[in-house]
Amino acid sequence: MFYSGENNLITDVDGILVGNAEDKEIGTGTTILIPPVGSTAAADVRGGAPGTREVGALNPYNLVDTIDAVVLSGGSAWGLEAASSAANYIGKSGRGFKTSENIKNVPMIPAAILFDLNNGGNKDWGDEPPYNNLGIEASTRASEKFQLGNVGAGYGAKAGSLKGGLGSASFENKEGLKIGGLFAVNSFGSVVNYETGQFWGASDELNNELSLIHI
């Protein structure tokens, strides 16, 4: 039997930190998840135009078997730059994949982006897209407590005709098993059952997170 975690956030899983950063003028943002050292990861890439970074390194047949962070970002292909600056920030502490002696460790930071270039923000950023700064800013803000909704990677997101955003949830059982999720929702189609006025996911809630919301 599972029940909601203490804060109903992915950071209820021990050792996980999350940070958000936004550029309100441009209408975009970045989110970083920093797990404990030695954490493993896997990826399932879907969609007609996915945008990812270092996902191939997660293949269990490959050499790298741990990650140092995961970055979610707006900005389409430009947003992947947020992971590069996050790698620089995290790498300063010496964290990363050890290749050999006397060579810098290489932070492993898979990333995925969403398309938010059509949300009306000022995308005329010239020679300096904002994602380098957003990656660093999100990294410096990483903590156990973080905001949801119109923040981070979800800042410029849409959910059909509605505003998208950043979501999170956690579950625990009596044996101490903890599961957490972090989502940047930028979906196509309707997220609402207009016959009931509720979100389609309301039937799967645990503590009335969605059933009290009517559109």
What does each of the following model-derived ranges do?
Residues M1-I213:
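Alpha/propeptide regions of enzymes that mature by internal proteolysis
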